Amino acid sequence: MEIKLEEILKKQPLYSGKAKSIYEIDDDKVLIEFRDDITAGNGAKHDVKQGKGYLNALISSKLFEALEENGVKTHYIKYIEPRYMIAKKVEIIPIEVIVRNIAAGSLCRRYPFEEGKELPFPIVQFDYKNDEYGDPMLNEDIAVALGLATREELNKIKEIALKVNEVLKKLFDEKGIILVDFKIEIGKDREGNLLVADEISPDTMRLWDKETRDVLDKDVFRKDLGDVIAKYRIVAERLGLL
């Protein structure tokens, strides 16, 4: 698939978020640009880290490919060096789908879970993707009442999320990394199929070194734990991308 990158990037983005910009290629496809911006606390903390966009595009592409190889349908089409991805155009469902294998982050702030302890089973959590309301947690009734998804779609989304977890947990385990938790977004294509969309990167996952439990994700930036790009590079290296 040949695309004229420079011409596409001259267009006004369809969407420009905290760390990515999305450009239309045609009626069915978009170009996702992974920028070097890094944020935490819903954008309250912000910096620009050279090389982050490249690493996230590279890692996301690899993980989308792994999902596709294991029967999980995604919006991913192709990686374009250095920081771009071609993807199917989808309508994003405004629900953040979070899967947790180990207690960490907000789960420990909100509930009496012990930080770092393995959960008895993967917990699937839905949050309303809405900055104005602070991305509150959803239950099924609220999601349906708000018209975000049907009950059938929510059941399917949970099924997809658990399959994503199964694939990625195994992949990272083989690379000496613990998949603590992650969030994904789900989009609908023209036919109404549910596809894993957005990105899957150290921006959207918690990853710990299996032996040392060193943090290899955006918590390094959130908590000022050191050089976040160096940690992202470790993830890319373990995945055989560098």
Swiss-Prot record:
The gene coding this protein: purC
SUPFAM superfamilies associated with the record: SAICAR synthase-like
Signal peptide limits: none
Pathway recorded for this protein: Purine metabolism; IMP biosynthesis via de novo pathway; 5-amino-1-(5-phospho-D-ribosyl)imidazole-4-carboxamide from 5-amino-1-(5-phospho-D-ribosyl)imidazole-4-carboxylate: step 1/2
EC assignment: 6.3.2.6
Reaction catalysed by this enzyme: 5-amino-1-(5-phospho-D-ribosyl)imidazole-4-carboxylate + L-aspartate + ATP = (2S)-2-[5-amino-1-(5-phospho-beta-D-ribosyl)imidazole-4-carboxamido]succinate + ADP + phosphate + 2 H(+)
Family: Belongs to the SAICAR synthetase family.
Classification via InterPro entries: SAICAR_synt/ADE2_N (IPR028923), SAICAR_synt_PurC (IPR033934), SAICAR_synth (IPR001636), SAICAR_synthetase (IPR050089), SAICAR_synthetase_CS (IPR018236)
Protein name: Phosphoribosylaminoimidazole-succinocarboxamide synthase
Record's keyword terms, sorted: ATP-binding, Ligase, Nucleotide-binding, Purine biosynthesis
Gene Ontology MF, one: ATP binding
GO process annotations (BP): 'de novo' IMP biosynthetic process; cobalamin biosynthetic process
Enzyme class: ligase
Species, as recorded: Methanocaldococcus jannaschii (strain ATCC 43067 / DSM 2661 / JAL-1 / JCM 10045 / NBRC 100440) (Methanococcus jannaschii)
